[in-house]
Every structure is written in C-alpha cells, then in structure tokens.
Amino acid sequence: MLPVEPHLETWSRRPSSRSGRPPLLFIHGGYTDGWCWTPYFLPWFASRGWPAHALSLRGHGGSAGAGMLFATGLDDYAADVERVAGTLKEPPILIGHSMGAAIVERMLAMHPVRAAALLAPVPPTGLVPVAARLAVERPDYFAHMMGLDPMRLSADVLEALRPFYFSDRVDRDILQESAKHLANESPRAILDLSMRLHWLKPERNGAHLMVLGAEGDRICTPQDVRATARHHGVEA
C-alpha cells in the first residue's frame, strides 16, 4: 500500500429529519469519480430517511493523489473508504459499483462491516474474461476503452460508450455532465481486478450482503452477477 493519505472529495445528502437509519457510503467504479452518485442515488435515499454519502477515490475527481495513480491498488482505495467511513457518526452500509464493489469485497475480508451491497460487481473470474467477451462482441467499445483519453473525448467515443453506461431515458444534461467526470484509471487497480482468481475464499464476517445487477447490463451480465452471489453464498 502507498504510505500517503491524500485529501478526499466527498458529497453528502442528509434527510430533512432524523430517521434513526444508518448512513450509506457509496463507492464509485473505475474511470469516473464520486459525482456519479449525486444526480439520483444520494437525493433518492436521503429523501427516504437515509443519510447518504459518497467519495471520490484518490486520483479521481477533486481528490488528491493523481500523481501516484499509476501505482494505486485496490487496498489503497479501500484505505480511502475506511478513512471516510471513520468520519461518519456511526459505521455505514457500504455500497460499491463495479470496481467499487471489489473495494467493498476487500473491506469485508479485512474487518467487520455493518452491511454491504455489490452493484454490477466484477465477477470472481476477474476482468480478463469480461474484456475478451467485449473484444469479440463489441470491438468498437473495447477499442475506445483501451484508448480512452478523458481530455480528448470525441462525439464518436461518447456515442460508442453511451449504450454501455447509460439508460436510454437518461437526461441529456446529466449525460453531458457525466462525460466531464470520465477519468483515467490506475493500471495497478486494473491488474488487481484481473487477478481475482487468486483471491482467498471471501469472508463476510457476518455482514449482511446484497448482490445486485441489471438485466440489460452489457458489461456485467446477469450471469456475472449470479456468479458473484454464489461466490459469497447469497442470492442475486
């Protein structure tokens, strides 16, 4: 792990009145930052009585650490989540998407977690089979992702990525804002995600766990989601 503890960008939406419900902490996936939770997830849960929080992992969004991004691994990201969780009034429920779900899995094995949800998680076999499938089925998407440069996003790149990351019903303004939050990802973290077959049998330390995916997801298929659920001994 890296020795530094960089400044981390956070967002919070709180209920209008006390509900007694524990806080939620959302962890984003790769190639983006914590802003992705702000249009829908944070306000939706806050309006229903859940204190909702999100962070940008180091090297993403407004968080520091971009200079060391190339050497940043999942354990470093897990340390970021642990730091932010420690600032909350009580232990949060962790909710991670894709790479963020893998970070949550790391934390489940490290120490007790109140409860957790894995949204469209990287499957137990890692990223390599996923990348191989996409290279065959959607070479246009695969080529764009391999050469993604967030500073030079062309219209054809965004059009190729849209059906993989956004609903057809997404608001155009949110779609355009989302493009501003695309970012490079750590090669070390991608390697960690690619080597998941070498992980030990996962430990949940008694935590309640939900594994959730979407039927129309073109990257994390329903089969991938069910494989992760079986890996943890739960139903998707």
Description of each model-found segment:
Residues 62-92:
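Active-site loop/oxyanion-hole signature of alpha/beta-hydrolase fold enzymes
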Residues 30-42, 223:
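The serine-hydrolase catalytic nucleophile loop
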Residues 151-207:
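Alpha/beta-hydrolase
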